[in-house]
Design a protein with these regions (language model features):
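Polybasic low-complexity intrinsically disordered regions
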Residues: 93-167, 173-186, 193
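A residue-level signal for conserved active-site and pocket-lining positions in enzyme catalytic cores
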Residues: 29, 106, 134, 188, ...
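Short amphipathic alpha-helical "interface-anchor" segments enriched in bulky aromatics
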Residues: 44, 280-313
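Dynamic "connector" segments at or just before major functional cores
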Residues: 1-105, 112-113, 127-139, 153, ...
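Short coil/turn segments at secondary-structure boundaries
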Residues: 86-89, 215-221, 299-305, 341-345
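An anionic, glycine-rich sequence signature occurring as long contiguous blocks
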Residues: 193-291
């Protein structure tokens, strides 16, 4: 697909015959704006006006640059699922088969959508993320955190997860979710939560009594003034778990202890996991657990800090969801470019260097 044709297949929400601007032009202008360090529709409009000559090299712009009000109105009315399908199809094309790959499932609030008098963001997005390629493969808007329980199976069902390893935090510790993952011929590593039908207590108590007699994988890190010791213990012995057979595919339990010193203060955390993996070393499964937080560091953090997503005050209709899709597409393009500079500097470079912007966009050619 040529970059100039990227958005042609998305249905225009405007009335036929009354639209001054092409939808494909509008979407490409916003994508370019977010690649070039813009925040919000007004900054995107300012950027497009300054770079109109460059944009005309690959856009039609029959009536010039659309106003920021037009950009906002289109994004409010645009079908989120169609725009998301473009992001997802691009990601799938790059990632290819998911066999033996780690897929991370996690949710994120768009904190800028918190309305006056409320504590909860009105928009929360659940994502499936390819850990190695650092790309979003699927996403779904949910009403609140508890809705992840029903949304996770729906989201995973959109992908061929055969032979992949799905990691989820404790919200995914549900029998229906483990069953679906195994039925789809994949494996899981899922965090345990303390209110999960006594399972947490049984696993925690068992490791407390037996960890001294089990082989442990110990690693140490020292960075940014923080010393950390990580201990991972894996056991395939499950006869101490009541109704273990109800957890489809359950083959192992894992204990992870993190002991660290931060500014001369000692911090200790203990976490427990269930998994369908068998025949793995503790170090291997510990690696999957640690990499699970890659979605926080490589996607959520950059959306918030590099793209200031939480500071975005766009709240109405479909605009917040559509903008997060554009941000993820921009993040994927910037992250995959081989330039050895920070993502923040890449955005600023794209704003200054038109050839660099074209290099980023050319990654969409699939």
């Amino acid at each position: 697909m040529d970059v100039s044709e990227l958005f042609f297949e998305i249905d225009d929400p405007g009335q036929e015959g009354k639209c001054l601007h092409l939808l494909s032009d509008i979407l490409m202008i916003v994508l370019c704006g977010y690649l070039c360090d813009c925040e919000g529709f007004e900054e995107v409009y300012d950027y497009a006006c300054d770079k109109e000559e460059v944009l005309r090299e690959f856009l039609e712009l029959p009536c010039g640059i659309p106003s920021h009000d037009t950009l906002n109105r289109v994004f409010r009315r645009l079908s989120p699922t169609q725009l998301e399908s473009l992001l997802i199809n691009w990601g799938k094309e790059i990632v290819g088969l998911l066999s033996q790959k780690q897929l991370i499932v996690d949710g994120k609030q768009l904190r800028g959508t918190v309305e006056a008098g409320h504590k909860q963001a009105t928009v929360q997005i659940l994502s499936v993320w390819a850990e190695k390629e650092r790309l979003c493969l699927a996403q779904k808007q949910i009403a609140n955190k508890t809705n992840e329980i029903t949304a996770i199976p729906e989201l995973l069902s959109t992908l061929d997860i055969t032979d992949s390893i799905v990691s989820i935090d404790a919200i995914g510790c549900q029998k229906a979710i483990t069953q679906l993952i195994v039925e789809r011929q994949a494996n899981y590593v899922i965090g345990l939560k303390s209110n999960q039908d006594g399972l947490y207590t049984q696993v925690a108590d068992w490791f407390e009594r037996h960890q001294s007699s089990l082989q442990a994988e110990i690693s140490r890190d020292l960075e940014h003034g923080r010393a950390e010791k990580r201990t991972v213990i894996l056991s395939e012995k499950l006869n101490f778990i009541d109704a273990a057979q109800e957890w489809v595919g359950l083959k192992s339990v894992i204990y992870v202890e993190s002991s660290r010193w931060v500014n001369q203060e000692h911090q200790l955390s203990k976490r427990y996991y269930i998994s369908s993996l068998a025949g793995y070393w503790a170090a291997q499964v510990g690696h999957f657990i640690r990499r699970h937080w890659g979605i926080e560091n490589q996607q959520h953090w950059h959306l918030d800090v590099t793209f200031n997503e939480d500071g975005c005050q766009v709240r109405k209709d479909h605009a917040p969801r559509n903008l997060t899709t554009i941000r993820k597409l921009a993040l994927g393009l910037i992250s995959r470019h081989p330039a050895k500079i920070s993502l923040k500097r890449k955005r600023k470079k794209a704003a200054r260097d038109d050839e660099f912007l074209i290099e980023l966009l050319n990654q969409l050619n699939i």
